[in-house]
UniProtKB/Swiss-Prot annotation:
The gene is oxyR. It comes from Streptomyces rimosus subsp. rimosus (strain ATCC 10970 / DSM 40260 / JCM 4667 / NRRL 2234). One of its GO terms (cellular component) is cytosol. It catalyses: tetracycline + oxidized coenzyme F420-(gamma-L-Glu)(n) + H(+) = 5a,11a-dehydrotetracycline + reduced coenzyme F420-(gamma-L-Glu)(n); oxytetracycline + oxidized coenzyme F420-(gamma-L-Glu)(n) + H(+) = 5a,11a-dehydrooxytetracycline + reduced coenzyme F420-(gamma-L-Glu)(n). This is 5a,11a-dehydrotetracycline/5a,11a-dehydrooxytetracycline reductase. It is an enzyme of class 1 (oxidoreductase). The keyword Oxidoreductase applies. Disruption phenotype: Cells lacking this gene are unable to produce oxytetracycline.
Length: 142
């Protein structure tokens, strides 16, 4: 499993993140999305109402490199920022979305983490930034 228990708890509490894909001409495309974490697979699952026709879906089908960010600012004074940043590869899948969310299209995007960077979710901000590469032994896809 590539995610720690604290990462899973944080991600489950959020529900929205930003997915960055690579466009047809190499330009970044960054959009807000709803998501779920699949603990069994160790992946992030992204669904949507018109997923199969979306630019993000087409981008992933052509170039599987993605970044995904989930963050929040639970306190402004003093400022507290928490985040999970995932770099990895993604699949544009023709089925599975409707199983997860009946109101969504059947197409979905599945993210396989290769690197995870976090800050602020450990409960102690003095611990700083945590970064690690995900190996096949961790449940990552190579």
């Amino acid at each position: 499993m590539p995610f720690t228990q604290k990462e899973i708890t944080y991600l489950r509490a959020q529900g929205y993140g930003r997915l960055a894909t690579v466009g047809a001409h190499g330009e970044p495309h960054n959009v807000p999305v709803s998501f779920e974490i699949d603990e069994e697979r160790g992946t992030i699952e992204i669904t949507g109402r018109d997923m199969g026709r979306s630019r993000k879906f087409r981008n992933v089908a052509k170039n599987d490199r993605v970044a995904f960010v989930v963050d929040d600012v639970p306190c402004r004074d003093p400022e507290v920022v928490r985040a999970v940043v995932i770099h990895g590869t993604a699949q544009a899948l023709p089925t599975g979305g409707r199983e997860r969310r009946p109101h969504c299209a059947d197409e979905m995007i599945r993210i396989h983490p290769r690197r995870i960077v976090t800050w602020g979710i450990e409960g102690d901000l003095s611990t700083g930034v945590h970064a690690r590469d995900i190996t096949a032994e961790d449940g990552g896809r190579r």
